[in-house]
Structure formats: C-alpha cells, structure tokens
Amino acid sequence: MNGPAADAAHPGPVPTAAPTVSVVVPVLDDAAHLRACLALLARQTRRPDEVVVVDNGSTDDSAAVARAAGARVVHEPRRGIPSAAAAGYDAARGDLILRCDADTRVPPDWTERIAARFAAEPALLGLTGPGRFYDQPRLLGRVRSAAYTAAYRWAGGAALAGTPLWGSNCALRAEAWRAVRHRVHRHRADVHDDLDLSFHLLRHAPASTRFDPGLRVGAAGRLFGSLDARVRQGRMAVTTLRLNWAELSPGMRWVRRVQAAARP
C-alpha cells in the first residue's frame, strides 16, 4: 500500500528531544571570579537551560552576583567542595549536568560541544577536557597546564582504570549521578570530589568516561600559589585513593574494565 494511508500506518522515526543542560558552579567568597564566569555562560552558543550556583557559606556578595545573573542559588552550609558539588548535582534539573568552578573561563561553544558529544555517544556517562592556567606567566603557564593535565589524566587514569573527570571542566548524565549519589564521599572535605566521583562512575559503568582535548577552558592556577596548597592537594589525593581502593582495588578495577571491553 502506497500513499498517505501507508505513511500514516508506518510513520517515520519520532525526533528525539534535545537534552536539557544544567551548569553547576560551587562558590565560596569568590564573587569577582563568579561574575566573569556567569557572563561567559550567558554568551554560550547553546545557552544552558539553567545555571545552579551553590553558595558554600560565602561572606561576600557571591549569592547576590549569582541572582543578578539569573542563576538559581542553592545554599550548602557544610563546608567543602564535595558537599557543595553534590548539592548542586542534586538540585540540577537537566538531563546533562555540566560542572565548572567560579574561576573557570569557558569558551563560547562549551555547552554546545558537550551536548553534541553526549548526543552522539549514548553510552557516554562522563566527559572532561583540559585547562589552561590563565593567571600564570605565558610560557610557564603553558608548561604547567600541559604537565598538570598529563599527570592528572594518566596517573589518575591508571589509579581508577579509566578517564578521571576534572571538576573545573566536566559533565555527566543526570541518570549517572543518580546512580552514584549515595556512594560518593560527599561529606568528606578532605577528598578531591572530581576524582572521587570518577571512581564511582567507573565502578558503576567501566570505560564510560572520556577526555576531549578540544574541550579546553581557562582556570586559575591557585594550586601553584604556595607550597602549603600543593601539600594539601597531595594529601587529599592520597585520601581519595585510599578510600576508593579500599572499596575496590586497582587490579580489580582494571579486570572489570577489560571484561567490559570484551563484551559484544
């Protein structure tokens, strides 16, 4: 049978609605950086459906800056990025949850590029990219940016048997967050929340995170501000590894990844 009747009996594929996008930005007393970050988010080629700013107990006007920019403000009284980030992910209403920090400088196509990548790869649960430390001397900043990205990507990847997400520039599916939200160490301020989240995402679904070298953002190089800051970051990394390796050893994580790759 041909003609309109046949077309009605065998309709074409129903278009899939584009995923909605939430951007989560934790902040603590960082109003000036936050203002610049929100201005860049407002100029995206694919505007986010919402921006959620998590005020982690600021004493400056960070919350007022967020509201003035049209962001939804969530208050998280428990200090620490793990608690603040988790509160933002919980509050996000989008199908995709994008994360950056108040000092992140995103390019104009940041949300568009991320949304397109997730649309093209249904099995993808998490996506991340590199950063450039914009507050460092030019040559030194390039060296530090490349070294930091390589160390985090490869050392972190070996530790968790997959690609680690970087909190200044990452995204995940809301359904993936819901699957691990009760497992992450959200109430421990002494862990790296992004690495901890990566451990749990990859335990939930091995080989489900990716690194996009073109998804580059600017970030403040606060890590290099003092020796104390670097020591503190190192201790947090050790704590994050210890907690997650106690749940599942590195060897077993790699076994699970190989098994996942071998499945048809």
Question: What are the residue ranges of the model-derived segments?
Answer:
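Glycine-rich, basic loop-to-helix element that forms the pyrophosphate-binding segment
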Residues: 76-92
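Acidic donor-binding loop at a coil-to-helix junction in glycosyltransferase catalytic cores
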Residues: 188-197
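Short, acidic, metal-binding catalytic loop of nucleotide-sugar glycosyltransferases
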Residues: 39-48
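A conserved acidic beta->alpha catalytic loop
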Residues: 33, 40, 55-63, 104
